[in-house]
A protein has these predicted regions:
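Mobile gating loops/cap/lid regions near enzyme active sites that modulate substrate access
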Residues: 399-427, 433-583
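Gly/Ser-rich "nucleophile elbow"/oxyanion-hole loop immediately N-terminal to the catalytic nucleophile
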Residues: 114-116, 172-182, 189-211, 275-279
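Non-catalytic accessory segments of hydrolases
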Residues: 2-177, 349, 376, 380, ...
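Loop/turn elements at helix/coil->beta-strand transitions in domains of secreted/extracellular proteins
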Residues: 114-119, 126, 151-155, 204-208, ...
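Short beta-to-alpha linker loops that shape the active-site pocket of alpha/beta-hydrolase fold enzymes
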Residues: 162-164, 244, 458
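Substrate-access "cap/lid" subdomains that shape
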Residues: 90-92, 189, 196, 200, ...
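Short glycine-enriched nucleophile-adjacent loop
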Residues: 217-229
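Gly/Ala-rich beta-loop-alpha elbow adjacent to hydrolase catalytic centers
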Residues: 212, 216
Length: 583
């Protein structure tokens, strides 16, 4: 099984593994602005669930979603998880999909209805092209239960948003009509609904923290940078796991890279039979809105449902992230952000044996044609600069030799499967996709005097092969305190020896830190030194040098480290973020 296949197996989602079956004794009722909902009481967790609550009118395709504008008498049920929005990837397996998908779920502790509780709003990941709030791995019951046990109860919310082309249409026509970045706008509308209605569930609208992983963390960053950092009072804190940084730049080539997004749109139009004759004209959107959803879905499956991305539209994103960070045009709220030690094993190429292989991959993914216009440098020279900062030395690549002691040699099985420069390749692409943007954000927050915290997750879950290291997504079960392993196969907390007990203890530590931040905007809470092996989790400060300090989560505890690993490579990426990567 390849690393990619192993990762997909870990992420498998049989629908039978959805949240613990609710045991209804009496249905909780809540009256919001539009009417009254009946939820479900779960006696096992002593929690109330309100599931599949709409936060918008059924969306008009390729249009900005509108808030609810009708009221009703009587009681509507909120007993079932919503469908997924249309998406393209394994996270869709086993789930019904629909364009009518803008719903959210609320999990609250029972009996605390008028306490003004802090709220944690989860934004799922999946590349902005797959996933949904009904995913059992995002079961909010466990972290809500943990919050009650700590004496710091919170309300959990999870939300859907449109994906792929439905949510992230690109091209000149979409920008002209103001319908780019619709998925992020959906999230914004959900946060507005929470702001207006969460008090009815016992939540405090002034104590909302948004959190997400991967493209969910990218979404969290998008909300922080949205509208030039405008503060709409929708949330006061943000947590980004493996993805916080720059929502723009998926099509590198510098700040004038527009050909590939337009080409993606044109190819999509040509793949829709009812609209292909209009490709290249200015009237394609009207046609795309009229055809059946099944025709759009089939076209995306054939033309690339995973090819869509956020774009600079002059409205939701008024400027590039690089410029906003430099000028302080972002929402100045406390953030807790980080990533996993070996992110690159999920994003690097395979079978990279020599410099030529690596150069080819870098040119495809990072430094394409056109950068000469924005950098004034020769493309090959830029590749040389990058490779100089990432030497072919397995002792400094990922996964580390501590995590996986095997040194890849010519002729061994790992060389055949992964390539001789596997570790070097992983380090470059992991830093590019996940790490440098996060570090750049921590530094910007520090320069502008805003509290931020950084972590590095360094625990390899049960079922993750050693050669994959501590890869992408592996912290999610620990954050949610999902020690039952709901939605996972195998259970990340299974295994032999002391690992299960140690992993569960670390999950308690991590989820406690997140709960502390949601309550206090500080992960330390009242017992920081006790929580972090005698240390306090420090805010990210630059007074002692060019890099701050953060917490590392290990299987046997935590320690504090200076955030300066692979500094040369990530500094180069940050310096070229706008001119090469277009963010």
């Amino acid at each position: 099984m390849s690393l990619i296949d192993a990762g997909r197996a870990l992420l498998s989602l049989p629908q039978a593994l959805l949240y613990p079956p609710p045991q209804t004794t009496s249905a909780p009722l809540v009256t919001v602005r539009n009417g009254t909902y009946s939820g479900v009481y779960n006696s096992q967790y002593d929690q109330d669930y309100f599931l599949g609550v709409p936060f918008a009118q059924p969306p008009v395709r390729f249009s900005i979603a509108q808030g609810l504008n009708t009221t009703w008498d009587g009681i509507r049920t909120a007993h079932e998880y919503p469908v997924h929005c249309y998406g393209y990837g394994w996270d869709q397996d086993g789930f019904e999909q629909s364009e009518d998908c803008l719903y959210l779920n609320i999990v609250r502790p029972a009996g605390l209805h008028n306490h003004g509780l802090p709220v944690a709003a989860w934004i799922h990941g999946g590349g902005l092209w797959m996933g949904g709030a009904a995913d059992p791995r995002y079961n909010l019951s466990f972290i809500v239960e943990q919050s009650v046990a700590l004496g710091k109860p919170v309300i959990g919310v999870s939300l859907n948003y449109r994906l792929s082309a439905f949510g992230f249409l690109m091209g000149k026509e979409a920008i002209k009509e103001g319908v780019a970045n619709l998925g992020f706008r959906d999230q914004r509308l959900a946060l507005s609904w929470i702001n207006e209605n969460i008090a009815a569930f016992g939540g405090d609208p002034n104590k909302v923290t948004i959190f997400g992983e991967s493209s969910g963390a990218e979404s969290v960053a998008a909300q922080v940078f949205a509208f030039n950092g405008r503060d709409d009072g929708l949330f006061r804190g943000a947590i980004g796991e493996s993805g916080f940084g720059a929502p723009l730049g998926r099509y590198p080539g510098g700040f004038n890279a527009t050909e590939r997004p337009q080409g993606t749109y044109d190819s999509f139009v040509r793949s829709v039979p009812s609209c292909k004759k209009l490709a290249g004209s200015d009237s394609t959107l009207d046609c795309l809105r009229r055809v059946p959803s099944e025709e759009i879905d089939l076209a995306l499956r054939s033309s690339g449902g995973q090819s869509w991305a956020p774009v600079l539209d002059g409205d939701f994103f008024a400027d590039y992230t690089t410029n906003q960070l430099a000028s302080g045009r972002f929402l100045k709220i406390p953030i807790l952000i980080g990533a996993n030690t070996d992110e690159g094993t999920s994003f690097g190429f395979r079978r990279v044996d020599d410099d030529d292989d690596l150069r080819a991959g870098i040119k495809v993914m990072m430094i394409p044609y056109g950068v000469e216009k924005t950098t004034g440098k020769i493309r090959d020279g830029l590749v040389d600069e990058l490779l100089e900062r990432y030497p072919n030395n397995q002792s400094i690549g990922i996964p580390s030799l501590e995590t996986w002691p095997h040194v890849i040699q010519p002729g061994d099985g790992y060389a055949e499967e992964f390539g001789l420069q596997y570790r070097r390749d992983n380090a470059i692409f992991g830093d590019y996709v996940m790490q440098y943007q996060r570090r750049r954000a921590n530094k910007a927050w520090a320069k502008h005097g805003v509290p931020s915290y950084v972590y590095r997750f360094n625990i390899r879950p049960n079922g993750q092969p050693p050669e994959a290291g501590v890869g992408h997504f592996q912290e999610v079960a620990f954050v949610f305190h999902n020690t039952n392993g709901d939605g996972y196969e195998p259970n990340p907390f299974g295994g032999n020896g002391t690992y299960p007990a140690d992993a569960k203890a670390m999950s308690k530590t991590i989820s406690t830190a997140w709960i502390n931040f949601i309550n206090d905007l500080d992960p330390n809470g009242d017992s920081g030194p006790e929580l972090f092996n005698g240390n306090k989790w420090p805010t990210y400060e630059l007074s002692g040098g060019p890099n701050g300090k953060g917490v590392v989560f290990n299987i046997n505890g935590t320690h504090i480290e200076v955030d300066d690993w692979r500094a040369g490579g990530m500094e180069w990426m940050a310096e070229h973020a706008l001119t090469v990567f277009g963010n």
